[in-house]
Amino acid sequence: MQRAIYVRPVGIFPAPVGEDGENVWSGLPLTGQPLRFATIEIVEREGVRIARRLASVSDAFERDWGRYTLEASSLMEAITAPRARLAGLALDVPRIMGIVNVTPDSFSDGGRFSSAQVAVDHALRLAEEGADILDIGGESTRPGAETVPVEEELARVMPVIEGLRPRTQMLISIDTRKADVMRRAAAAGADILNDVSALTHDPQSLSVAAETGLPVILMHAQGDPKTMNESPRYSDVVLDVFDFLESRIDACVAAGIPKAKLVADPGIGFGKHLHHNVAVMGNLALYHGLGVPILLGASRKKLIDHISDVPLPKDRVPGSLAAALAGVAQGVQIVRVHDVAATRQALAVWRAIAHNTNKV
């Protein structure tokens, strides 16, 4: 379903640590983080017609938005409301999800961690480097990837989860599109479900996700991984992604998954060409209107090569850090990365400078 109005906070700025004021004149708080905004972009959409205008927060509250008033007000409430903890993890500061690919064909590190013990050791190393969440995946969903049979995926990820759970209290996320893998991973101690299809690939995944009671990360992707980047089409990629994620959030809530347990991922690189990815990256703050935390996964992805001519994924760390910082500056709560230590250092320096404090 297509929305009629969207609201994007712009001019986001850091709030000094300890500031308590929350009036429109000093800006409004962004999702409970030490970030504020005093200007919004109002986007009106009717079919193919899209109109955009900027307004100060104070002006927006003083004027009549006509038939959009109620809808815009609900979006503003979603943008300013603090986010619930994710499996016990507070989201008042940016959090790091470390990637553990137990696959032979991942685009970045395929085959490096394909044995269970090597993957467990790698995951524990990411935890030591500062990861808040460990994301375990046994099926590559890179462009062109083939579907992995469920038994093979289980054989890859279950020994890793079972090997990790007794050795760490770190949050464990299972990156899968399959209901059987979700169910087995949850029983083995996984804390979060991360589905690149937003619970659409497997007809049973929505009900199984609800049964587990675990938080769910819903990602936008256009098409199947094997063909998704051949010819993606959008009316407006930024708004279309919003509409898709909002529809999946509604479907989850209808299935019995509380909205407070959902996270939205706009799906950088999934059914998107460079101009699509850049547009989404530049408008991440719009997705706060969904009323759930935002996860950004741009680490080592092809868009970095397209922008800066870096063919090898392992050489894309600087571009990955730039993408992560661009995200957290727009209020993204979670960054999914390969290079945890470098990301942690970059975020610590950014926070210290942005908030004029060394309490990172």
Label the model's feature ranges.
Residues M1-A87:
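N-terminal accessory interaction module
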Residues M1-P34, L91, F107-H122, T141-L164, ...:
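Active-site-adjacent loop and "lid" segments of alpha/beta metabolic enzymes
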Residues R83, L89-M97:
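Glycine-rich, aromatic-flanked loop segments that form ligand/cofactor-binding clefts
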Residues D121-G137, Q330:
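Catalytic domains of carbohydrate-active enzymes, especially glycoside hydrolases
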Residues P258-K261:
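Short acidic capping loops at alpha-helix termini that bridge into adjacent secondary structure
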